[in-house]
């Protein structure tokens, strides 16, 4: 598997992956984070336009999608019940989704992000136990609560 930037031609496949992820989240006890409506089409189109949307794929299929944001994340300005590990520049990973068709998608995207920065922040909903486990298994530490 490899990572490439998403293009406008990928939009329908990306939305299909998000639909699968929405259903997985709802079925696993996390019905409110995305529900059936998030991420919104406009958000996904804007991510592609800004060139911050990435795909995990091989030569035949797309298995996952995620967004990398460089610079300050507004929702990270206030953190409760903890502190960030440092105040250095960082990248943030958002809107991670997989179609579940291949193992190792999360590890692939994390390795890619680590090649871009040694200071990565990632967050998820309190009810998203699947993502919390993936994040922890890949060496991230819980720093606190953000809104």
What are these regions (language model features)?
Residues 115-127:
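Conserved GNAT acetyl-CoA-binding A-motif
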Residues 55, 61-71:
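Conserved beta-strand in the GNAT
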Residues 1, 60-65, 91:
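Glycine-rich phosphate/pyrophosphate-binding loop shared by adenosine-nucleotide-utilizing enzymes
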Residues 22-43:
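Conserved GNAT-fold acetyl-CoA-binding loop/helix
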Residues 123, 141-147:
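Conserved catalytic-core motifs of GNAT/GCN5-like acyltransferases
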Residues 98-115, 132-137:
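Conserved acetyl-CoA-binding loop-helix of GNAT-fold acetyltransferases
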Residues 67-101:
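Conserved acyl-donor/pantetheine-binding loop and adjacent beta-alpha core of acyl/acetyltransferases
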Residues 2-16:
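A short beta-loop-alpha structural element at the N-terminal edge
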């Amino acid at each position: 598997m490899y990572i490439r930037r998403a293009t406008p031609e990928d939009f329908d496949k990306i939305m299909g992956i998000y639909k699968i992820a929405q259903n997985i989240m709802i079925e696993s006890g996390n019905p409110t984070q995305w529900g059936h409506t998030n991420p919104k089409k406009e958000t996904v189109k804007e991510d592609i336009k800004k060139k911050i949307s990435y795909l995990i794929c091989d030569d035949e299929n797309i298995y996952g999608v995620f967004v990398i944001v460089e610079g300050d994340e507004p929702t990270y300005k206030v953190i409760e019940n903890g502190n960030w590990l440092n105040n250095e520049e960082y990248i943030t990973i958002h809107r991670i989704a997989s179609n579940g068709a291949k193992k190792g998608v999360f590890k692939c995207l994390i390795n890619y992000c680590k090649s871009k920065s040694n200071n990565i922040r990632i967050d998820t909903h309190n009810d998203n136990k699947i993502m919390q486990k993936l994040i922890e298994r890949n060496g991230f530490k819980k720093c606190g609560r953000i809104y």
